[in-house]
A protein has these predicted regions:
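C-terminal target-recognition/interaction regions appended to catalytic cores
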Residues: 1-135
Length: 135
């Protein structure tokens, strides 16, 4: 199976300089305030911080000096590997300065599928529970 949405970003030398100094589980802001960034390297032994629409730029791969791909963020959000995100990968603007919904945005704005399933099942259980079962 081909894994979709797993293209790495080509980082500028200045971005790589920032990424390289962040230890596992650490944040760039803990090292130097001069960068003015919230880059954080994920700790593979801890839960991920919340994935958001705009925060995708902040997640550094635990072992590689790069940001996470759309697919890696989607895995954190519990999307199945066969799920494909469409549209542009990164922010792009139309001539009217309207931001299009990016693949990163789709992942960050989504309710994690396993969470949605758990909530739906809880509602279903409550909704279809027979009143006589409660007595």
């Amino acid at each position: 199976m081909a894994i979709k949405n797993h293209q790495q970003t080509a980082h500028s030398p200045s971005t790589l300089e920032k990424i390289e100094v962040v230890p596992i589980g650490g944040k760039l802001s803990d090292i130097a305030q001069t960068f003015g960034s919230t880059y954080r390297r994920l700790d593979p032994n801890k839960p991920s911080p919340t994935v958001t629409r705009s925060g995708y730029r902040d997640f550094i791969h635990p072992y590689e000096n790069r940001m996470l791909t759309v697919r890696e963020l989607a895995c954190l959000q519990t999307f199945p590997l066969e799920w494909e995100f469409t549209g542009t990968r990164l922010d792009s603007y139309s001539s009217k300065r309207i931001v299009t919904m990016t693949q990163f945005g789709q992942v960050g704005n989504a309710v994690p599928p396993l969470l949605a399933n758990a909530v739906a099942n809880a509602i279903k259980t409550q909704f279809f529970t027979n009143e006589s079962d409660d007595k």
